[in-house]
Swiss-Prot record:
Name of the protein: Large ribosomal subunit protein bL20
Keyword vocabulary terms for this entry: Ribonucleoprotein, Ribosomal protein, RNA-binding, rRNA-binding
Assigned protein family: Belongs to the bacterial ribosomal protein bL20 family.
Listed Pfam families: Ribosomal_L20 (PF00453)
């Protein structure tokens, strides 16, 4: 069986990693070994943060809704409970958007839950 040298494959693999590491600071973007470590770490962070982003945005929406609801004299939990009882099907993202962009409409929604 003939000996197979890895020239092409190894170079492509290294270049792929270095391409992913472009823009990293110092040797992290130029030396293969450190670049490989940084790329693996970056990919782990990206995977984790794609999931975390969903949680973070939900927390942001809830904080905005709570602040706007308290301006209307009702707490967040009572507002959400009232929306469920009144069968108002609007999600937290849209509620937060209303609270920021159109406070008068948000007040209308709050009043609908108290009736």
């Amino acid at each position: 069986m003939a000996r197979v040298k890895r020239g092409n494959v190894a170079r492509k693999r290294r270049n792929k990693i270095l391409r992913l590491a472009r823009g990293f600071r110092g040797s992290n973007g130029t030396l293969f070994r450190t670049a490989n470590q940084r790329v693996m770490k970056a990919l782990c962070n990206a995977y984790r943060d794609r999931r975390r982003r969903k949680r973070d945005f939900r927390r942001l929406w809830i904080a905005r809704i709570n602040a706007a609801a308290r301006l209307n004299g009702v707490s967040y939990s009572r507002l959400i409970g009232g929306l469920k009882q009144a069968d108002v099907r609007i999600n937290r993202k849209m509620l937060a958007q209303l609270a920021v962009a159109d406070p008068s409409s948000f007040t209308t929604v709050v009043n609908a839950t108290q009736g």
